[in-house]
């Protein structure tokens, strides 16, 4: 039963998790939170990760009640993600691997989400909707690859929500998307917004540009409230995601759908997806914020699967890449 530690830091969350044979032993994380109306810059985010890495590592070991010599493999996020934060965490992982004299594995961030979702929910072979601040993909497994059947052609859905939260000067604590979700619950009026679906692909830049331009006018004229705008944005973008996911399920003949990624925590998205799934006689699988949001355990779990099949990354190849597509990885651990 190998024990694997995973280091995640592709965006504003630093997480270190430990997995042993499918059991999460520890999974602490720390989030870099900026003032309302601001995003997070790569350099500042990397500095945050550097400052908190030792503390989070110590917490992970203490909570798991294990020692460095009990670890069999070190795993880190190779990509995709923001360059500076990725590198900052990779340096920590490489250093730990050399100090502890352990093998190291570079893990695809998206595959970490998928494998964690499968582990926690028990989903067997689902169509996967991966939605976060940096990614929006509809995925299914086929012939040793996680195939991308549909994706955003511009910005990610989480990026769309986060940027609109800045327009409204919403707090980034715990996350802008969460605060939009809470405001949307109070919205009563649905504002018509651009709806762009192209086959199984989606586009969010147009809807964001439109609502950014119209927000001041609509709010100053009291045609609607900020809550109405949050409600309208959520309903529109989530309807787009449900439509494309259903199309992929029909194409693959799937009776399971799994939502992963930070936006997957959204209860309204889960609710809308569940309605669609039940109408198709399918089942929805979703996780809570412990595992939907970026965390170290998901990197450990994907790395554990890879380690079991003999995958190890030579130290000189433990680089990072901001662009690392899901379908680039050969999935050796699945039939």
From Swiss-Prot:
PROSITE patterns: GLYCOPROTEASE (PS01016). It catalyses: L-threonylcarbamoyladenylate + adenosine(37) in tRNA = N(6)-L-threonylcarbamoyladenosine(37) in tRNA + AMP + H(+). Keywords: Acyltransferase, Cytoplasm, Metal-binding, Nucleus, Transferase, tRNA processing. Its main location: cytoplasm. Its cofactor is a divalent metal cation. It is found in: Cytoplasm; Nucleus. Substrate binds at residues 130-134, 162, 177, 181, 266. InterPro entries: ATPase_NBD (IPR043129), Gcp-like_dom (IPR000905), KAE1/TsaD (IPR017861), Kae1_archaea_euk (IPR034680), Peptidase_M22_CS (IPR017860). Component of the EKC/KEOPS complex; the whole complex dimerizes. Component of the EKC/KEOPS complex that is required for the formation of a threonylcarbamoyl group on adenosine at position 37 (t(6)A37) in tRNAs that read codons beginning with adenine. The complex is probably involved in the transfer of the threonylcarbamoyl moiety of threonylcarbamoyl-AMP (TC-AMP) to the N6 group of A37. Osgep likely plays a direct catalytic role in this reaction, but requires other protein(s) of the complex to fulfill this activity. Belongs to the KAE1 / TsaD family. This is Probable tRNA N6-adenosine threonylcarbamoyltransferase. The lineage of its organism: Eukaryota, Metazoa, Cnidaria, Anthozoa, Hexacorallia.
């Amino acid at each position: 039963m190998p024990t694997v530690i995973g280091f995640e830091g592709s965006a504003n969350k630093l997480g270190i998790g430990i997995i042993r044979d499918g059991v999460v032993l520890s999974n602490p994380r720390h989030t870099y939170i900026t003032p309302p109306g601001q995003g997070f810059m790569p350099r500042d985010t990397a500095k945050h990760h550097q400052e908190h890495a030792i503390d989070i590592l110590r917490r992970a070991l203490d909570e798991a009640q294990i020692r460095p010599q009990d670890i069999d493999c070190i795993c880190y996020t190779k990509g995709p993600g923001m360059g500076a934060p990725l590198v900052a965490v990779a340096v920590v992982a490489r250093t730990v691997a050399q100090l502890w004299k352990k093998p190291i594995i570079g893990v695809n961030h998206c595959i970490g989400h998928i494998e964690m979702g499968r582990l926690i929910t028990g989903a067997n072979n689902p169509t996967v909707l991966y939605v976060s601040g940096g990614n929006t993909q509809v995925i299914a497994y086929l012939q040793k690859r996680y195939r991308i059947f549909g994706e955003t052609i511009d910005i990610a859905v989480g990026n769309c929500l986060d940027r609109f939260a800045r327009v409204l000067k919403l707090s980034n604590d715990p996350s802008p998307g969460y605060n939009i979700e809470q405001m949307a619950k109070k919205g009563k009026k649905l504002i018509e917004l651009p709806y762009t679906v192209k086959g199984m692909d989606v586009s969010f830049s147009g809807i964001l540009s439109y609502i950014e331009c119209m927000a001041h006018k609509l709010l100053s004229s009291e045609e609607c409230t900020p809550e109405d705008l949050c409600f309208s944005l959520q309903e529109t973008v989530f309807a787009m995601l449900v439509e494309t996911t259903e199309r992929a399920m029909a194409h693959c003949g799937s009776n399971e759908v799994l939502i992963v990624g930070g936006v997957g925590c959204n209860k309204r998205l889960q609710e809308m997806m569940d309605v669609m799934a039940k109408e198709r006689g399918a089942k929805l699988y979703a996780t809570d914020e412990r595992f939907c949001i970026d965390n170290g355990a998901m990197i450990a779990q994907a790395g554990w699967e890879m380690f079991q099949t003999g995958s190890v990354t030579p130290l000189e190849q433990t680089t990072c890449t901001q662009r690392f597509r899901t379908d680039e990885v050969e999935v050796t651990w699945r039939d």
